[in-house]
């Protein structure tokens, strides 16, 4: 019998100044959510997946590691007509369907129907026949009636409407996901897969980004992509547009980037210039409160994502890369140390309830004032 998909929570790296997205002030009315139930056959879903109408996160597909015995048991369950757990999917505004809970199962169906693996370790027997007709068989080697039984298997889908509030969408998928536990950025990567998510992937794989962040953000959890997503949101949409809902804010940035692919090279240039400036000014203490410790030999602290927001976004506004030896470089270094060390309002804004609208606007306003930059 098919076992439930395992839920292995990824190890979380230590990050300061990071609120779980969705801790903003604004709530959402439950009666605004629209979830409908539909039943589709395996055959119908696979056709739509191959036509890119139903979307599988390509990053997940590349990392697909479901054990072969679990893949075989899924196919065996279909042949034995054992009901499968429901699937949760999200509808895009453009009409495509993004599979969020059930990726392992759909990927397994795709792989088996495409003859990518043999069924192994099964105990299926047909009535009156002691031989196992499916053991060791590729899909094309099965009797036609068993091929049809797999393709005709009915799957229950709960479809979340495209107009549901962003935080509600992620909250629901976080609650219902029965497979490998996904971070909210991994869910965004699936829902908004396109030029924006591919661009984020390219940025975080660069040596410049890895060096500037001290390799502190785990690619497995996509915390690295989330950090860049935050830079893009505050840079493109502006701090003044932030209303306390980080999920919606980050999603808005991804929507913009998907629709304005020609802007991505310019955004990359500003971001990379900012990373180099942060490296020049703060070295191994970039984006860390340990910058305020005396001496260059002080231990490196934990990366603070709120400092990352402030320092990358503000330094990206300077026309040129900033060197520590320059007058502006010395001023910025001194002022940031003072903010981290002596300004209680700034310290609170990068440490507690950091998704709160007031905290976000406070830390940006104080840093912009100290660095001599207009908002």
Spans of model-derived segments:
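A short, surface-exposed helix-loop junction/capping segment
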Residues: 51-58
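Flexible hinge/switch segments at interdomain interfaces of large molecular machines
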Residues: 45-49
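C-terminal subdomains that position terminal phosphate/3'-OH groups for nucleotidyl transfer/ligation
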Residues: 228, 232-375
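Basic- and aromatic-enriched surface patches that contact anionic nucleotides/nucleic acids
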Residues: 2-44, 58-255, 334-337, 341-357
């Amino acid at each position: 019998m098919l076992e439930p998909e395992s839920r292995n929570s990824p190890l979380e790296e230590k990050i300061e100044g990071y609120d779980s997205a969705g801790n903003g002030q604004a709530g959402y009315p439950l009666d605004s959510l629209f979830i409908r139930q539909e039943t589709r056959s395996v055959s119908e879903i696979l056709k739509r997946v191959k036509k890119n109408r139903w979307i599988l996160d390509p990053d997940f597909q590349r990392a697909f590691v479901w054990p072969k015995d679990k893949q075989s048991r899924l196919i065996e369950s279909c042949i034995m007509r054992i009901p499968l757990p429901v699937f949760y999917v999200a509808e895009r505004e453009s009409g495509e369907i993004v599979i969020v809970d059930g990726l392992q199962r759909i990927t397994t169906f795709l792989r088996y129907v495409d003859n990518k693996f043999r069924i192994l370790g099964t105990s299926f027997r047909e009535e009156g026949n002691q031989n196992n007709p499916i053991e060791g068989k590729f899909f094309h080697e099965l009797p036609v009636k068993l091929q049809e039984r797999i393709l005709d298997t009915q799957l229950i889908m709960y479809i979340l409407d495209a107009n549901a509030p962003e935080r509600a969408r992620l909250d629901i998928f976080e609650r219902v996901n029965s497979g490998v536990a996904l971070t909210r950025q991994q869910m965004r990567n699936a829902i908004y897969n396109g030029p924006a998510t591919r661009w984020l992937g390219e940025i975080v794989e660069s040596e410049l980004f890895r060096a500037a962040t001290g390799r502190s953000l785990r690619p497995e959890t996509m915390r690295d992509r989330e950090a860049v997503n935050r830079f893009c949101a505050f840079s493109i949409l502006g701090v003044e547009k932030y209303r306390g809902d980080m999920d919606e804010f980050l999603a808005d940035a991804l929507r913009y980037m998907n629709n304005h692919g020609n802007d991505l090279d310019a955004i990359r240039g500003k971001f990379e210039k900012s990373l180099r400036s942060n490296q020049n000014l703060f070295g191994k203490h970039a984006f860390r409160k340990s910058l305020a410790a005396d001496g260059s030999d002080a231990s490196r602290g934990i990366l603070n994502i709120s400092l990352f927001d402030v320092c990358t976004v503000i330094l990206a506004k300077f026309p040129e890369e900033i060197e520590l030896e320059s007058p502006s470089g010395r001023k910025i270094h001194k002022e940031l140390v003072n903010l981290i060390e002596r300004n209680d309002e700034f310290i609170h804004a990068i440490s507690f309830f950091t998704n709160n609208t007031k905290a976000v606007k406070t830390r940006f306003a104080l840093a912009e004032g100290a660095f001599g930059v207009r908002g």
